């Protein structure tokens, strides 16, 4: 008969620090609740909850009000009937090196690590859990100021399309799952700050330290999340390139991006329009609704660009000075021009690029 999980609360334990745990050879197992995992998790980790949210809340209450022994006893009674099922969900990964984590490197991850070890798994615990990972990420982000080439231009000019195609780029909107506009969440599931920062760290921490990185010009906030302060500062100091394209080209690209032809998309777009009344006035918003209902999408987009997006862009960028201006009518040619500009940049100096200077 298999021992109860409480028998694995003490004993020898193999553990590693965050920097080791993030190596590609590790398979990360998050034993926190699905709610905790959703709120913030190490990118790529697999969620195998030991308890659900209600059970965890109950155990925590017992721990605070009665004591550790009562909490452990209740936790064991919850887990025991499900232990075989829990184990079976992890069997497909038995040949891999597993790293188990919970919130702070406490009882959940320790007991599971020892239990899996007794079952023949190669397994280790992440010291300090997700909290230690968050510290690690934030320590990196607070000083991350790489040399940047920042693409600017009006809405629809093709900045995001170029960022997706350029080597050595960071797609902030993809990391945030938001296009950084009033309609930016259509077709997407915006991420929260913790998950955005985790993915940002994963994308940037292994990049060459002195090479210029392409990034799209953004405000500090992208949808629901904020760009790390040090990186936002690097964007202000980076090489600035202005991209230009005709109204016709911009409308076509926006239409291809949003493809507002299905009923659900049209409903989401129409639901956002009332938020524009203060900027555009009631009459223009009603005109936009009419065009949407008539499937006159090109006219709909043109009015939004002329009356909303372009004036806001001109106001926000009026004091900018650019290192280069490029046509973005032919994105393949623009990409070649940008790569040429990148190649012409000197490798960032010997001084640490993360410094404040």
PLM features: what roles do these ranges have?
Residues 43-44, 146, 234-239:
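Short glycine-/polar-rich loops that comprise or flank the Walker A/P-loop
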